Amino acid sequence: MNNNDVYLGNPNLKKANTTIEFTEDNIREFLKCKEDPVYFANNYMKIVSLDEGLVQFKPYDFQEKLINNFHENRFNICKMPRQTGKSTTSVAYLLHYCVLNDSVNIGILANKAATAGDLLGRLQTAYENLPKWMQQGIISWNKGSLELENGSKILAASTSASAVRGMSFNILFLDEFAFVPNHIAESFFASVYPTITSGKSTKVIMVSTPHGMNHFYRYWHDAERSKNEYIPTDVHWSEVPGRDADWKAQTIANTSEQQFKVEF
């Protein structure tokens, strides 16, 4: 790929209408990834590690289960402790969805616009490190949104009715939904729910650490009792390799028992 084919001087991105020749191996891999988002995450998703820099994402068992749940079900609700890789796992699926499906719209919404922007930033880093034959050409690439040559678009914003009014999404990803004030959560769902139910394959993924009695609690409570369509996934802190009784004792010693109960 020569310099004329890169997007706005970024050598990690190809611009729209760039010709790439696929090998037979590329085609096989592309089809395999399209069928299996866990295979895609294990082989093509790069993340930035605090200790090692840019590394290949290797999901834990519970993260693979989450990705499969996102893929196989329309409505997912996930109750997860801090630092269990919930953002990375979610981004892996959203990246798979936008690259390997044409003309899809994804909304990444969080309790704060900066948090949503950070999630999109992680997705963009992973995208830049995909092989060029797997990338779509770039139409637009911004801090709060992107558009790919295959027609797929992603918007990152704070969770509010005004952020999504008049728009339709194939996936709505709601991060830290338990931290969205009740009145905002209520008006948000009143505004967006008709557009979700108008499609037969639209998805809602709700992920949060618990935070009191609120909309997230109600959705979770109803999901556990099969009173709504959400598939509940509860991740325990001990499911992360290396987190055992000693880790718990050390974490409590460095913080407090109360803080551990809140965050884990």
Locate the predicted segments by residue.
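Phosphate/NTP-binding elements of NTP-utilizing enzymes
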Residues: 2-264
